Curated annotation (Swiss-Prot):
Residues of the ABC transmembrane type-1 domain: 38-321
Free-text note regarding domains: In MsbA the ATP-binding domain (NBD) and the transmembrane domain (TMD) are fused.
Bilayer-crossing regions: 34-54, 80-100, 138-158, 164-184, 263-283, 292-312
Subunit structure: Homodimer.
Catalytic activity: ATP + H2O + lipid A-core oligosaccharideSide 1 = ADP + phosphate + lipid A-core oligosaccharideSide 2
Protein name: ATP-dependent lipid A-core flippase
GO terms assigned for molecular function: ABC-type oligopeptide transporter activity; ATP binding; ATP hydrolysis activity; ATPase-coupled lipid transmembrane transporter activity
A Pfam short name: ABC_tran
Gene designation: msbA
Organism in which the protein naturally occurs: Burkholderia thailandensis (strain ATCC 700388 / DSM 13276 / CCUG 48851 / CIP 106301 / E264)
Alphabetic keyword roster: ATP-binding, Cell inner membrane, Cell membrane, Lipid transport, Membrane, Nucleotide-binding, Translocase, Transmembrane, Transmembrane helix, Transport
Protein family per UniProt: Belongs to the ABC transporter superfamily. Lipid exporter (TC 3.A.1.106) family.
Domain of life: Bacteria
Domain ABC transporter: residue ranges: 353-589
Membrane topology field: Multi-pass membrane protein
Length: 596
């Protein structure tokens, strides 16, 4: 299955993501720490300056310190200066490492927190569009690539660039003619880096896409392991995984080939320059234009400049990985938030619901049909309304409009006579409790799951568990309500997970309930107890019930039958059976299945 990571996109309103664009986006995070950063850069500058100090000490030692006639002062101060230089370098190196690590980790913390906050406040469409593996990859792993850029790349760019500048300055001081030969290298290297840089950027983006696809295959296989095993799908999944892994390896090798060209080509150009320098230096020495100390100092400085140049060449690959990671990170940060709604407060709703000419579509379909088409109905406070109809008729979409998971394409949804966008989104959702057929539990205690989003009160948790027919089961557990339920409640049975989700809705005590196939996972005995608890709970509360099993909704005050996104029938269970329409047809089919 091909999954394109739609989070990855150019950032900052530019045609392409570049280091300059990324730095502009990072500036708000860097600004509060700018003086710490400046101190770190100054410490790096001190480290870079010590590189030029090494050949600078060699020249007087060779010119004035060697031999029986050598200057004693030079013989003494040069070794002492070497020790002092090494000590200063060590202190500056430690200071720069600590200060830059402080800055980068603080930025990493701020980025990761902002990414998670933005993710959790995005609309439902974001979670439908993106795979979990892509989002996890961006929040947990890709942000570390930016840390790599902030640390490794920044240290390399600043420290080694300054080292090159200091060494070039010293070379000009020693012999400007020879230095011009070295300087010719730099434009050649810059052109070479630019060519390799563009190719690496493209390869890194494609590599990131394949990495997300590989993570998605693992996510699917782990999540659907039962289906994989019962259908003997191991060979198919292994084949998918191996094929994509080989493609990923191919891209990695292409990146290695492209990135690895920079260093040997740089060394080759440097060797040509060294050969020319040696030739000219020999000619100058014959004319007494240079000394042995000056020549050795020049060659030493020139050789010392090669190492930081290599580092600057090697910075391409991590830099391009960082740019690709930045696209994911800022792509997530730039995701639009859910609308916060109006400023109208809603302490506790009476529960009156109105759908007025509501239409909704997830996108443009080939036949132009909408998921919901001009739906209108009202629900009185405390009324229980059931939604029935064949699969795909729009039942779940309809109830998803109530907590504003989506907004209608046209028409208005009202609670207590007020359009939903006028309410604060937080206040609106406080009025709604939902139990879905896809039970979601968190890897926490039973009490924390029951009171999710609120402060757990043991008496309230116990009452909710009793109402959901789960209290005796919980008290039999070693840690009671403090028992950890595991990943999505894997330590509980299917029926226990369903009842725990119902207990969560009971604990919330919201005036509006949405029950989406709420008892479908229960055995007959548990369903009987839970149904009784739900009937008690629903008294005085507005309830919307979705069920594929019609027996669940027979006792509803009113049943709305949907087909093709429209309400085609409305009435009580008995009235709809007497009409002999779609509801009666569905009831007859299910009755025959149950009898069979």
């Amino acid at each position: 299955m091909s999954v394109k990571p739609t989070l990855s996109k150019p950032i900052g309103g530019q045609d392409a993501s570049s280091p300059a664009v990324v730095m502009r986006r990072l500036w708000p995070y860097v600004k509060p720490l700018v003086w710490v950063l400046v101190a770190g850069v100054l410490a790096m500058a001190a480290v870079a300056a010590t590189e030029a100090g090494i050949p600078a000490l060699l020249k007087p030692l060779l010119d004035h310190g060697f031999g029986s006639k050598g200057d004693m002062t030079t013989k003494l101060y040069v070794p002492a200066a070497v020790v002092g230089l090494a000590l200063a370098r060590a202190i500056a190196q430690y200071a720069s490492g600590y200060l830059l690590q402080y800055v980068s980790n603080r930025i990493l913390l701020d980025l990761r927190i902002q990414m998670f906050e933005r993710m959790i406040h995005t609309g439902v469409s974001f979670f439908q569009r993106e795979t979990a593996s892509t989002v996890i990859n961006a929040v947990v792993f890709e942000v570390n690539q930016v840390l790599s850029v902030l640390m490794g790349v920044m240290i390399t760019l600043v420290r080694d660039s300054l080292t090159v500048v200091f060494l070039l300055g010293y070379l000009f001081y020693l012999n400007w003619r020879l230095t011009l030969i070295v300087a010719i290298l730099l434009p050649c290297i810059g052109w070479l880096v630019g060519k390799i840089n563009r190719r690496l950027r493209r390869l890194n983006r494609e590599h990131q896409t394949l990495t997300n696809q590989l993570a998605y295959i693992v996510e699917e296989t782990v999540g659907g392991y039962k289906v994989v095993k019962v259908h003997n799908g191991e060979s198919y999944e292994i084949g998918r995984f191996n094929e994509l892994s080989r493609k990923l390896r191919g891209y990695s090798m292409r990146m290695t080939v492209s990135g690895g060209l920079a260093q040997p080509l740089t060394q080759f150009l440097a060797s040509i320059a060294l050969a020319v320098v040696l030739t000219i230096a020999v000619v100058q020495s014959s004319n007494d234009q240079t000394t042995v100390g000056g020549f050795v100092a020049f060659v030493t400085a020139m050789l010392l400049i090669i190492s930081p140049l290599k580092h600057l060449m090697d910075v391409n690959q991590p830099l391009q990985r960082g740019m690709t990671a930045a696209e994911l990170i800022f792509g997530l940060i730039d995701e639009p938030r859910e609308p916060e709604g109006g400023g109208k407060p809603l302490a506790r709703a009476s529960g009156a619901i109105e759908f007025s000419h509501v239409s909704f579509s997830y996108g443009i379909s080939r036949d132009g049909r909408q998921t919901l088409d001009d739906v209108s109905f009202t629900v009185a406070p405390g009324e229980m309304v059931a939604l029935a109809g064949p699969s795909g008729s729009g039942k779940t979409t309809l109830v998803n409009l109530l907590p504003r998971f989506f907004d209608p394409s046209s028409g208005t949804v009202r609670v207590d006579g007020v359009a939903l966008p006028e309410y604060s989104l937080h206040d609106l959702r406080n009025q709604i409790a939902m139990v879905s057929q896809d039970v979601v539990l968190f890897n926490d205690t039973i009490a924390a799951n029951v009171a999710y989003g609120q402060t757990p009160e043991r008496d309230g948790v116990e009452a909710a568990l009793r109402a959901a027919n789960l209290w005796e089961t919980v008290t039999a557990m070693p840690d009671g309500i403090d028992t950890l339920v595991g990943d999505n409640g894997m330590r509980l049975s299917g029926g226990q997970r369903q009842r725990l989700a119902i207990a969560r809705a009971i604990y919330k005590d919201a005036p509006i309930l949405i029950l989406d196939e709420a008892t479908s996972a229960l055995d007959s005995e548990s369903e009987r107890h839970v149904q009784a608890a739900l009937e008690t709970l629903m008294k005085g509360r507005t309830t919307l019930v979705i069920a594929h099993r019609l027996s669940t909704i027979e006792r509803a005050d009113r049943i709305l039958v949907l087909e093709g996104g429209k309400i085609v029938e409305s009435g009580s269970h008995r009235e709809l059976l007497e009409q002999g329409g779609l509801y009666a047809h569905l009831h007859r089919i299910q009755f025959q299945q149950d009898a069979g």
